[in-house]
């Protein structure tokens, strides 16, 4: 990127927008089943489960942002809250909810808006539910690179 006196230029910003709109979307994991994330069991409702690695470090080698979470499977009828984290410090970058009940199976692509994540960052996730029964969610992520 071009900088004048160390400051971002209008050209820099236009380039980022151009790349965002015209680069192809990606999915992770690709050509594989989604990653399973599990809620806690026996520690209380709406308590986040253990962090699970969705995208390992050094996998996405360009800056990126996440636009959708693909919910591939939900284990039980419940409300699920998913939290995404990035980097070694596990900084929260997004949070969404999905419901599975007698009328909705909960499998869908949920829009999410994350900040631009640094290249080579890992992405981890955790879920919570009101049931406290160890529910699971299988997910993959749709993202764009810059």
How would you describe each model-predicted region?
Residues 1-146:
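Beta-strand-centric surfaces of beta-sandwich/beta-rich domains
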């Amino acid at each position: 990127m071009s900088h004048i006196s160390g400051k971002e230029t209008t050209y820099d910003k236009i380039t980022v927008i151009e790349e965002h709109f015209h680069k192809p979307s990606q999915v992770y994991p690709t050509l594989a089943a989604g990653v399973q994330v599990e809620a806690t069991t026996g520690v209380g409702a709406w308590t986040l489960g253990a962090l699970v690695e969705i995208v390992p470090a050094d996998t996405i080698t360009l800056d990126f942002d996440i636009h959708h979470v693909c919910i591939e499977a939900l284990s039980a009828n419940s409300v699920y809250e998913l939290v995404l984290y990035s980097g070694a410090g596990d900084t929260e970058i997004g949070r969404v909810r999905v419901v599975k009940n007698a009328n909705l199976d909960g499998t869908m692509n949920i829009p999410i808006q994350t900040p631009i994540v640094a290249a080579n960052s890992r992405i981890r996730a955790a879920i919570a539910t009101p049931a406290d029964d160890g529910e699971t969610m299988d997910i993959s992520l749709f993202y764009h690179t810059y």
